[in-house]
Amino acid sequence: MIQLDTSWLQHVQKPARYTGGEYNSIVKDHSTVDVTMALGFPDVYEVAMSHLGIKILYGLVNRREDAVAERVFAPWHDMEEEMRKRNIPLFSLETRTPIKDFDVLAFTLQYEMSFTNILNMLDLAGIPMYAKDRDLEFPLLVCGGPCAYNVEPIADFFDIVSLGESEEWGDECIDLFKAEKAKGFPGGKEGFLRKVAQIPGTYCPALYDVEYTEQGDFKSIMPRFEDVPAAVEKRIIEDVENVFYPTKPVVPFLDIVHDRAVLELFRGCTRGCRFCQAGMLYRPVREKTPERLLQIAKDTIANTGYNEISLMSLSSADYSKLPELVDMLMEEFKDKQVSVSLPSLRIDSFSIDIAKKVQQVRKSGLTFAPEAGTQRMRDVINKGVSEEDLLAACTNAFKSGWNTVKLYFMMGLPTETDEDLAGIADLAYKVLDLHREITGKRNGSVTVSVSFFVPKTHSPYQWYGQQDVEEIHRKQRYLKSLINNRNISYHYHDGYTGYMEAAFARGDRRLSKVLVEAWKAGCKFDGWTEFFNYETWLKAFADCGLDPAYYARRTRDFDEPLPWDHLDCTVSKAFLKREWEQAVEAKLTGDCRRAPCKGCNVCPELNTAIIDYKEGGRVEKVTFGLK
């Protein structure tokens, strides 16, 4: 066990990030289990502890008697300095065991700009970065999460990649590891990887060869062995009603980003927003019943003492039994001062009655996501809402006592013009004027938050070349010039960070050396504006003979092989191409959840179904139309 000396620990910010011992944390004697796992998250404690996936994995592994999972997060700059000064290796929170002593180190990957933190954590742990330099004396490196659907830029660092939902997959892998470990890994590391590659949803990068053309374009990625699958199909949980859910999560000692109980209403989203990668990755929609959700809420509140429950899914307001669930939660917790919160809502799903109910305990502003300023642009991205929808929702809100509205938009979308940007300012002014008209007061406020569009894999825009950073900055200045009212605040994201994110989002294996060079030059916590160094990143690319524009700004041909083609989210390329063509013509595609099948291919490919409770009972939609 690593000893933490208070003589120096008191000099770092928030030492509770590193001490462990939180309520509901689980400590096991490593000598009594067969498999030890460190769950890594490449960001600071407050961000990592807010992530539901970590909570699920932590509870999932620790419910087994033969395994233990402990947590490890990226140390903040001051803590890293102290650790390096004192030769303290990266350690787990629960038992302060050096990370290199675990059997498995499993990272959750949410964001491309956290990749250098992975390298920094490996270096602090004394673990070689490249998989080829590690034998079984070191932990097996595993990763999962949305970035796994194009893991190629970091594939050289990882041994095993989990594609899809990991509850069943994790148990299968632990069982195999336990059995092979007991036999002494007779086939060595490669032999074990060939066996684990047989588990559906498993990608082992070392078992594949990558080929490029003479011009330097990606050509193919092929398995090195006949028993290794050419493509890896994602795993899903069909029965989300009864799947494991963490009702006894670790309660942190310090404030974290999302410090509350979380209810996952359903998985998947079929709204079909064309910019949205998550809506493609997590199909099909599978709901939990209100009764199951109420029980989860009761257990979690009893086990944690939280005073807030967040209703979380990709589009929470689309939950078919939302009014009933809210009534059940409010009745259960009405005398316990436990509030219920909803994230940003789709405008067409908004119910002022629900909003009023959930804010009986604590009242806050309302958040909507029109995404674009004009109807043409909203149709292009398949948002499927109108200005009338937004103004009607705001009218109801203002009449019911709300004074604050936050609006989310995106900038740099395909076919976007300055007229579309002007529409953002126009909408903000209309909402503000509406408040004054309804209330007769001038205390209304509108927050306009505009992000820089990053094309992502497995979406209809995966072929689209991102707009030039200087053009984005021009657009940001233009929009700012149109907003001149102290009651409208305007926030926008840095274009340079989005540029690097796009390069890694659509990158190939050659980018691993760029990451190493950038890390050597001091890059880490790149998702934090104050630590991102654009010039250092450009130099890292140049030193490796690569250009970020090749990955971020280049529009691909439909027939061009893509570095992530072998990582199958089961949404067909034909469907994505059809959606691109629909976007160019500004045509809408309906939601297959309550309309005819749109032919994305997920349900028949996975032999599964949409699970919805709209009609009162469980409805499994299993008919398919388009191919």
Predicted feature residues:
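N-terminal pre-triad scaffold of radical SAM enzymes
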Residues: 37-43, 58-61, 250-275, 301, ...
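Glycine-rich beta-alpha loop elements in corrinoid/cobalamin-binding modules
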Residues: 74-222, 460-508, 516-531
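Flexible glycine/acidic-rich beta-alpha junction loops that bind and position SAM and/or redox cofactors
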Residues: 77-78, 153, 209-213, 320, ...
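Cysteine-cluster motifs in flexible loop/terminal segments that predominantly coordinate metals
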Residues: 276, 556-626
